[in-house]
């Protein structure tokens, strides 16, 4: 992964924790994602901020520090992890300032922030693979380049507001499918709002696809 792509994620949330693993490798931890740092000298979080060009009087606006991976978050292989297919749904949605891509699992779906995926998506790799793994009661996505772990990324929490908007979108798509194949002369202006194919005449929320808190 390129340093500039990893730095972009850190700058977005102003979070920079430099984490050492048991093998002596270093990682950037933004609390939403962990990325392997390669081709760089050993550094502290202050060194990382200096590389970003953050002025001394602005560093106090960052959440930063050093940590050691005692829990084994960066362990290459974890018991029970399952390989995923990236973007099997073939769709992304924009919500609360994020572009979210669904990753299907055998028992649900994980919505992943594309900003967090960008550093690994832009890697020059033909062997990139995604794995579902558990971590302290939650599910994470581990990204490997061949046999080497390069990132561990948290999915976005699906709150009630997000689920409501997805349900509205699904219902509206079902309604629209009801008009497919209907000849234009068969549709009146009134039908467009109160047709028999409509599941509800309730007005669609004007903020659909925006707002809400994660």
Pin down the residues of each PLM region.
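Intrinsically disordered, low-complexity linker/loop segments enriched in Gly/Pro
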Residues: 1-23, 27-37
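Exposed alpha-helical structural elements
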Residues: 2-5, 47, 116
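C-terminal functional regions that serve as terminal interaction/effector modules
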Residues: 30-33, 53-214
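Short amphipathic alpha-helical linker/capping segments at the junctions of internal repeats
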Residues: 41-50, 159-162
